[in-house]
Amino acid sequence: MVFISYNTFGAGNKSPARTSQKGWIHVLDGCTPWPDELAARYRASGHWRGETFDRLLRAWARAHPHRTALVHRERRLSYAGLEAAADRVARRLAGLGIAAGDRVVLQLPNIPEFFAVFFALQRLGAVPVLALPLHRRSEIVHLCRLSEAVAYVVPDVHQGFDHRELAAEALKEAPGLRHVLVVGDPGPHTPLDGPGTDVPAGPDDPSDVALLLVSGGTTGLPKLIPRTHDDYAYNVRASAETCRFGPDTVYLAALPVAHNFALGCPGVLGALHAGGTAVLTDEPDPDAAFALMERERVTATALVPPTARIWAAATEWAEADLTALRLLQVGGARLLPEHAQQVRDAFGPVLQQVFGMAEGLLNYTEPDAPQDVVLHTQGRPLSLDDEIRVVDEHDRDVPPGTTGRLLTRGPYTLRGYYRADEHNATAFTADGYYRTGDLVRRTPTGHLVVEGRVKEQINRGGDKVAAAEVEEQLAHHPAVLDTAVVPVPDDLLGERTCAFVVPRPGATAPGRNEAAAFLRERGLAPYKVPDRIETLDALPVTAVGKTDKKALTELARKLAAGGSARKEGNPRS
Ligand code: OOB
């Protein structure tokens, strides 16, 4: 086993794929490793323990084979059963020629097969690219091409959407894609179930990339976030410890498990790491979720703020017994103090705020934190080795307690997006800090309060929408000359999207329905379709001639409150 497989490369540099004598790819081409001295520090402090996810699953299955690992509807899978399922899928994939270093786009909802495939890929040393269930052609084709995926794993039909049709388009548009594997009725594709071949011993290097997470993004299409075994195993283990997960933990995954929060913060992997049970569902409405929580005696779950508020309201009339619940994590978007209070009033002192990101850094309010901290802050960094800087626009530290831009680096925060040299040059400082794009303030106790953001991203109740991506897509509409997408405040989701559109001379700008149909047709995920469309004769510009997003955000706010675009803000009317 090669313990230290990374060479030292600066942020933004490409590291070459390294091939061992046996032909395994050790470091994915296009990933930026941690510098040697930091890697050594993270190992010395016991954060990085040289674990791989394949060895972890085997160790769990050996330690308690008969305990329940996963529950889905009426199905219960023991740890031994999960390991056997992963082995079966690994044999299947090996039979198709999927091998160490290959990337596989995994787009499955919250079903046990997600984890069977995830761990099968770990077995093979192949790398899952975790697409969200709501991603559509635009995102999927991009993810397949960017990762040069050889396979794409989908359900047959999920929530009325036929993934086999999307897969057929992906096969046409992503040249490297060789296999589509379907859970359920395969249609023209390959069933995930089926015969396979022996699995060759895979690579066993903890500093290899274990998975690629998809970023919420701020520019154009989503980016890929390489997470190594060392860093993600630490992410999971430290989160499980902080959240006091143990063998009696019953974690309900109601958010998509392809998202970092429900996967590893501590999520399903945290529950498994602790020897507990994970219950999978994608029905987060309170009727279904509460019934499941009562049935399974769920002790912990994670929600985005809008769902947390809906659940809090539902406790007024719901009769389910939720007394087993000890931890209710809320994160992904800002939870206002008054909403935090509502959640706390409804569920008792089980609320935990989580401020995290797929890129790494996680902040949790501690389970025994004073109520004031839980209501008013978004938590404290998970690791003693998380380095935090709060800076102004020139990267100068702001005085303590002042709001500024959050920069971070640490043992589980990426050093570069996958194959994104140009973006990496600005997304990181020269000394490797990730520019989160979030505006925060640090309290004297070291807790962070998220005050806003500098990045152009709309946070639609936890679903991240990159303004640039929607703008790019809308610009393809034949009647659209120019466009700018901004957030509008929304009581439930926190924010919704508003697209300002300037029509081409003589053309009529598309209305909301037409724009929505157009964007869906182009394969954009449905949650990225603008909630509002407003027409302008021209976009306002700043002194240097850039689109004035500040003015547009203000205008969108006024319009949402009942004004008119032409009266209030169109500079040329
Ligand atoms: C989580 O991850 P992502 O990658 O979908 O989104 C990260 C961004 C952050 O940069 C921040 O802008 C926002 O989402 N965010 C919050 C927040 N938690 C995330 N903004 C305000 N308050 C919070 N509590 O969203 C994520 C990943 C792991 C755990 C939890 C959330």
Can you annotate each of these PLM segments?
Residues 381-385, 396-427, 465:
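Conserved ATP/PPi-binding loop(s) of AMP-dependent carboxylate-activating enzymes
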Residues 233-250, 260-300, 314:
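Conserved AMP-binding/adenylation subdomain of ANL enzymes
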Residues 50, 65-66, 196-216, 221, ...:
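Conserved pre-ATP/AMP-binding loop-to-beta segment of ANL
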Residues 298-302, 312-373, 387:
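Gly/Ser/Thr-rich phosphate-binding loop
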Residues 524-546, 570-572:
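AMP-binding/adenylate-forming catalytic domain of the ANL superfamily
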Residues 47-50, 54, 58, 66-97, ...:
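Conserved AMP-binding/adenylate-forming core of the ANL superfamily
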Residues 6-27, 95-96, 126-190, 505:
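Structural core segment of the AMP-binding/adenylate-forming
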Residues 91, 135-142, 152-154, 301, ...:
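AMP-binding/adenylate-forming catalytic core of the ANL superfamily
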